[in-house]
C-alpha cells in the first residue's frame, strides 16, 4: 500500500469561515497535525469577491481545500502515505471547524504498482 486518499465534500458550512484565509490556514495546519502528518509548506489564496483555495504540502503527501462561501460548500482532498498517518482525522477536524451540517466522505487505498513493488523487493535492480 502506498497510502490512503480521502475525498471530503462539506455542505452547509459556516460561510464566514469558508472565506477567512487566516482561519483556514490555522485549520489546515491543525488538521495535518491531527492526521499525524508533517507539514512542509502551506500556500493559500483568497479570491475576489469570495472563496479560498489552500494547499498543504506534507512530507506524506497533501491536503487541499477549495471553498465556495456563497453556497456554504468546500471540497477537500487528503492524501497521506505511510502506516503512521490518519487522514480521516484531518477530515474530521476540517468538518468540525467549518461547522458542516452535511458531508460526504469517500476514502480508498492507493496501491503500489506491481512493477514498483517488484523493484522494491529486488535489491540488485536499479532504476533507469
Swiss-Prot record:
The record marks 60-61 as: Cleavage (non-hydrolytic). The modification Pyruvic acid (Ser) is found at residue 61. Gene3D superfamilies: 3.30.160.750, S-adenosylmethionine decarboxylase domain. Its cofactor is pyruvate. It is an enzyme of class 4 (lyase). Pathway: Amine and polyamine biosynthesis; S-adenosylmethioninamine biosynthesis; S-adenosylmethioninamine from S-adenosyl-L-methionine: step 1/1. Keywords: Autocatalytic cleavage, Decarboxylase, Lyase, Polyamine biosynthesis, Pyruvate, S-adenosyl-L-methionine, Schiff base, Spermidine biosynthesis, Zymogen. The active site is at 61 (schiff-base intermediate with substrate), 66 (proton acceptor), 81 (proton donor). The keyword Metal-binding does not apply. It catalyses: S-adenosyl-L-methionine + H(+) = S-adenosyl 3-(methylsulfanyl)propylamine + CO2. Its EC number is 4.1.1.50. GO terms for molecular function: adenosylmethionine decarboxylase activity. InterPro entries: AdoMetDC_C (IPR042286), AdoMetDC_fam_prok (IPR003826), AdoMetDC_N (IPR042284), S-AdoMet_deCO2ase_core (IPR016067), S-AdoMet_deCOase_pro-enz (IPR017716). Catalyzes the decarboxylation of S-adenosylmethionine to S-adenosylmethioninamine (dcAdoMet), the propylamine donor required for the synthesis of the polyamines spermine and spermidine from the diamine putrescine. Heterotetramer of two alpha and two beta chains arranged as a dimer of alpha/beta heterodimers. Belongs to the prokaryotic AdoMetDC family. Type 1 subfamily. This is S-adenosylmethionine decarboxylase proenzyme. The gene is speH.
